[in-house]
Amino acid sequence: MSKAILLLRHGEEPAIQPNLDLSSDGQKRAERLAKFIPKEFGKPGSIFVASPSSSSARCYLTMRPLATALKATVDASFKGEDYAPLAFKLLGDPALRHELVVVCWTHNDLPSLAAYLNVRRKDFPTRWPDDDYDSLFVLSYKNGTRPVVKAMTQPF
């Protein structure tokens, strides 16, 4: 089996800022993702989120229903700007070599993370739109090559 990494943004945020939480739409998205991801891609072996900060816990809150449903843990040990260490872990850790890995991150940092994951610039947005909560990217790796990237829209 080849390695696959799902990259997605956290769920919707409340209109009133600052607010660390998800909006009601974001909470609904998190619940839907908990069903959609295993059904569409299989059970993930690992879930990574940007560590909660003083400005947001939305990545963790988006993945919590998935982790709960799968009785899995969420790795929140990387800060949002820790692209290189996270990419090194995702691509170099033998324990993750053949797993499906889900990564939920902040939209401003996803393009940089994708670059560290060897994604070609033409295959990923250089700037993630502020209003895009629906996109999901599947990075498929075989034998250490650059990933084949499939862009998807979440069906909800």
Describe the function of each predicted region.
Residues M1-H98, D109-F156:
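Active-site-proximal alpha-helix that buttresses catalytic centers in soluble enzyme cores
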Residues C104-T106:
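Short beta-strand segments
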